[in-house]
Amino acid sequence: MPKRTDIHKIMVIGSGPIIIGQAAEFDYSGTQACLALKEEGYETVLVNSNPATIMTDKGIADHVYIEPLTVAALTRILRQEAPDVLLPTLGGQIGLNLAVALSKTGILDELGIELLGTKLASIDQAEDREKFKELMQELGEPVPASLTVSTVEQALAFAKTVGYPVIVRPAFTMGGTGGGLANNEAELAEIAKNGLELSPATQCLIEKSIAGYKEIEFEVMRDAADNTMVVCCMENFDPVGIHTGDSIVFAPSQTLADREYQRLRDCALKLISALKIEGGCNVQLALDPNSYDYNVIEVNPRVSRSSALASKATGYPIAKLAAKIAVGLTLDEIKNPVTKTTYAEFEPALDYVVVKIPRWPFDKFTKADRRLGSQMKATGEVMAIGRTAEEALLKAVASLEIDQKDLLSKEAAAASDRQLEDKLVHAQDDRLFYIAEAFRRGYSLADLHELTRINHYFLDIVAGLVEEEGRIKAAGLDKEVIYEAKRDGFADTTLATLLGQNPAAIRAFRKANGIVPVYKMVDTCAAEFDSATPYFYSTYETENESRRSAKPSVLVIGSGPIRIGQGVEFDYATVHCVRALQKLGYEAIVINSNPETVSTDFSVSDKLYFEPLTLENVLNVTDLEQPVGAIVQFGGQTAINLASGLEANGVKILGTTVADLDAAEDRELFDQVIKDLNLRQPIGMTATTRQGVLDAAKEIGYPVLVRPSYVLGGKAMEIVYGQAELEDYLNQNADVTGSHPILVDAYLEGAECEVDAICDGERVLLPGIMEHIEHAGVHSGDSMAVYPPQSLSGAVKVQIEEATKKLAVALKCVGIMNIQFIIHDGQAYVLEVNPRASRTVPFLSKVTGIEMAQLATKVILGHSLAEQGYRSGLAPESQMIHVKAPVFSFSKLGDVDSYLGPEMKSTGEVMGSDTTYEKALYKAFAGAGMEVPDNGAVLLTIEDNDKAQILPLAKRFLAIGYRILATSGTAAFLEENGLHPTVVAKLHEQGQPAILDVIKDKHVDLVINTMGHDDEKNSDGFIIRQTAIEHHVPLLTALDTVNALLRSLEMTSFKTTEL
């Protein structure tokens, strides 16, 4: 069936900001789809609120709108652009929910706009829990005993009839949002209440738990002619009960007998046909490990996290082909872009094993609830490819970029047997390492299966690797044993630990004995057909399939898994670096480990190596490719941390040298540069002992900002107000040594701002200055920011410009750098310098029109700013106002304090742009999901330090028609100043109304809580904030953000004043 000619203009809905459950995979799939539609000759319109994406670059679609993903904003764009069709299945759950909401408003019927790909009825049938269950019964497909409920009482009554445990699955949500496993009545009441509040349809499925079954996923495709095919079958290491986004996943499936596979495959294809889905779809099934019985868990009628993983695991570009199917093409008409000879209807075949491990944020959130269940908690994931399951598993662990590089865990080794068993029964993010430790202690396969319900096959893989550790220790540096260990995925660092050597000695021994990796191609067909994919993974075999090109090449080091502090912004910069290299005639080689991103789309670079970002793996690639050099400026701290090891092994670091990178990161060297240039910075000291930290704080005077050197995302950074608090900080971050010093700075009050600068060694270009809306002390990644600045004087801008120029030249920056300033008493103080691309690159590139990463790449390769047509200094400011707002995922992470401070907590960002600051703010708040009505009620719980500031804000709330509720101390202060708030009883006070009831019963529309820096779980401020998050009441903890919100609300409200 040829493509449709009755449609010309297609509008695509993007997925919005990165949150837990919906990450960079949608940037990858949306970018692929937009380009595929353009390739077919259609005019495309894209709407997305996330500026940190390749998808929102000019040129990916014909018309790009960075606007809030709300019904109101989309309706305006639909009227303006009048597309023929709307494609919602590439925008994750947000895209689907918006399609349903737009349809209900009648705008699609009014404008005659058709839904492309999957029809509304199919979306509804797959997402509405009751309709889906009815369809399964019609098809004769088994589902767990369940009931769709719209009240907590119905949930409790059903659970009584089927017995506990039960699983709660809210309708129309993603990442298991609001769901969970309930073991008793109290747990069910709490989870069901939360799930009903979070479901757009106020609907939950209560399901008899089948926890312990094998969890199997099929990625399937279907076209309009009802051709269906399986792209990939994946099997979870963890049994049913843990969200698939929080599970280790193997592809292809490892433990299914042929009969089981065929039954489940038939079921998956039957479902996609019955739902009439056109495009890609994810089917989740549960298989009883003791029989052939299975249950259908759910169907996602859209591209998803799993489809991005399946695309990278197989090389089969699901989103690209789903977009082509949506416009009428069939699987037997579309050429497979990998082989270029076979058609898309051929099912991929794998002659390797892929392992995905989630990347959790618990290294940032040390007090978070780490237990895993049916609600997803991971921010990102890594993928590794090997010839065997063992090799792929160990490579995936090495890719995580956590303190744990292999299965040798110090924490697990130190646990008592009782603690160990508790960790095995109650799954957390680190359970794999405790399984390995249990085998070291002599636990049997049967013991561990009983404790974990994990399949014997997967446990046997871990047991085999633990046995091999023993053989390696016993044999010493033996050529045969080392070769076998490398084939099984053991890293040089692990072998060094086991043998009491250093990794360099292991590498030297390997090379001397010819134990070096070869690279195999990912070709979708297990080498059955000719293929020329430039997509490789390493293994220890004989034939090498990667050939060095005669063209000069440059290696670009990616940024690894998405995590808090290092998000999709760095992947954006990596992709632009690749584009610039290709324009300059170089072969661009990417090494990365993240399956969700655009940079690991093999069609982006000239060569892609899917490998852990460790020194060993990067050096193996440079040994083979012999690049001109490596670029580390765009891969975040991951790439910067590899620079000195690469240089020590003879790899040229292009751009700013390693010595100059160190000068910016090393406190004493940097302080000397500041002094030499006569610039201002807050008083600061470096301490290498616990007592040294305490002495430094005393000398500088409290409050002080304390942090370790060499960190990203403000990890372990805190504002400390007194000695007792500082001692608590040191107890939690006790690793203070000469190689791990602690920095102690005076904490200055003032406005923060930052610049990204590009320097060619002589000239320095500042594309723009971004002013932070929150006060100093809130991490720059969590602060709202505005460009151009709204309150900086001309004189301050000149100070910033001059300081940036001096620093860039003095630090011998060649490429890109980021500098943060604080404006205190009209003077600009330098806070910190990052000699690399920062998370602001995509935002500033979009709003200034200067493609910063491309410009910096050309500078790195010797093309001066003058040559590229740029002058030194601050670029002219734009006429439009642009506001960047952070987006958080607190509702997914229990026990994480939402109080904003110097440690970064946001997972994503949105942008609002308009002709005035107030309108841009309004859009940014709308994009971030801060839905506050024009009038209502606001609850104030304010720390004493902030009371003077709250008074004018409270008066402004009254002026626009808000009622004010406040706790006793805040209320007394407001009364003294002529305002009459309603007093609410604090947590430990008698009286009505009680503060938590006011929040739980939604008697307030906004909570403003600045009850500070004490983040102990039982502190009043923490409990109030958690209650607001759990009940989805908008919450603000910084008064500067409140001021910004008021400005946006005041813009939409009319004053009523008497004559």
UniProtKB/Swiss-Prot annotation:
SMART domains listed in its UniProt record: CPSase_L_D3 (SM01096), MGS (SM00851)
Annotated binding of Mg(2+) 4, by residue: E832, N834
Binding site for Mn(2+) 4: E832, N834
InterPro entries: ATP-grasp, ATP_grasp_subdomain_1, CarbamoylP_synth_lsu, CarbamoylP_synth_lsu_oligo, CarbamoylP_synth_lsu_oligo_sf, CbamoylP_synth_lsu-like_ATP-bd, CbamoylP_synth_lsu_CPSase_dom, MGS-like_dom
Entry keyword Repeat: yes
Note on cofactor: Binds 4 Mg(2+) or Mn(2+) ions per subunit.
Annotated ATP 2 binding sites: R707, A746, L748, E752, G777, V778, H779, S780, Q820, E832
Region (Oligomerization domain): 402-546
Region (Carboxyphosphate synthetic domain): 1-401
Domain ATP-grasp: 133-327, 671-861
GO molecular function, one term: carbamoyl-phosphate synthase (ammonia) activity
Binding site for Mn(2+) 3: Q820, E832
UniProt-annotated binding residues for ATP 1: R129, R169, G175, G176, K208, I210, E215, G241, I242, H243, Q284, E298
GO BP term, pick one: L-arginine biosynthetic process
Domain MGS-like per the UniProt entry, residue ranges: 930-1059
Cofactor(s) required for function per UniProt: Mg(2+); Mn(2+)
Enzyme class, broadest EC rank: ligase
PANTHER family: CARBAMOYL-PHOSPHATE SYNTHASE [AMMONIA], MITOCHONDRIAL, CARBAMOYLTRANSFERASE FAMILY MEMBER
Description of how the protein assembles with itself and partners: Composed of two chains; the small (or glutamine) chain promotes the hydrolysis of glutamine to ammonia, which is used by the large (or ammonia) chain to synthesize carbamoyl phosphate. Tetramer of heterodimers (alpha,beta)4.
Domain observations: The large subunit is composed of 2 ATP-grasp domains that are involved in binding the 2 ATP molecules needed for carbamoyl phosphate synthesis. The N-terminal ATP-grasp domain (referred to as the carboxyphosphate synthetic component) catalyzes the ATP-dependent phosphorylation of hydrogencarbonate to carboxyphosphate and the subsequent nucleophilic attack by ammonia to form a carbamate intermediate.
Protein's name according to its UniProt entry: Carbamoyl phosphate synthase large chain
Species the sequence originates in: Limosilactobacillus fermentum (strain NBRC 3956 / LMG 18251) (Lactobacillus fermentum)
